[in-house]
Amino acid sequence: VYLGGAWGSLFSHAGKGRYRNHRLRVPYPMHVNIGNPMPSNSQTHEVRLAVQELGSAYHEKAGSQKGSLSTAMIRSARQFWRQPFVSDTTDKRLTQGKALISSLLLRDRLKEELNAEDEAVGILLPSCVGGALVNFALALDARIAVNLNFTASSQAFDSAIRQSGIKVTITSRAFLEKIEIQELTDRVIFIEDLGKDFSALDKIKTALKARLYPMPWILPTKCFDRTRTASILFSSGSTAEPKGIKLTHHNLMSNVEAAMEVIPLSSRDGVAAALPFFHSFGLTGTIWL
């Protein structure tokens, strides 16, 4: 028997201290998953494996009802609109609401620069507010984010571009001056240009969208498919040609949910982006957690 949903309930030890940080929900949703009968002489590891398989089936079914990264971001922003969300060492600070508005503005500006063939888009940015917003904007436009490893060798860097098929890269002029990258894609979009000339009317209209519009009015239909690829990560390529891993929305959300079960984070906590966004933990643990 596997009990689904017990972690996070009022009587669980999720959070910092029992009975804290829980919103009382009545009735509280629980799932009881019953497997096939097992012999009374079953070994401990066999029982454990059977329970784990039931748990996997539960999370697979529960995950299919939670939407994609795009829908999760909008739901979270609307629920915690004024909560601090992202900041960096340049003293840029955004709440969840402002981050969503900025991401939607950035997405709409990127639509003018990208075409239908640009399904995968390269990102060459450090761990900063701008880098996070670009990842959010691409997710909100149903595109694939490819965070490129700017510490890799030129051969590994070029291989990642070739394998992912990206034709355009989003970067920063200031950042390019600090790193040793010889060649990029044929088309380069600078984030400094994307953030210019947003009118007050654009900001007001986007704020209303972010706060009030139904999700189907904001997001492309593809954004509701959690089986679509959300990001491509590459190995470092230090010992062989870099290997690319396609991560779906389901993959990333499952990793986030697994992390939340062992890391008792609350709205009062922050996560330091000690690892870059081209790193598996940097992507999952600091952008989407």
Residue ranges of predicted features:
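AMP-dependent adenylate-forming
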Residues: T71-Q96, T229-I232, T239
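Conserved structural elements of the adenylate-forming
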Residues: A99-L105, L212-P214, I245-S266, A274, ...
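Conserved ATP-dependent adenylate/AMP-binding module captured primarily in the ANL superfamily
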Residues: N135, F150-I181, F198-K203, A207, ...
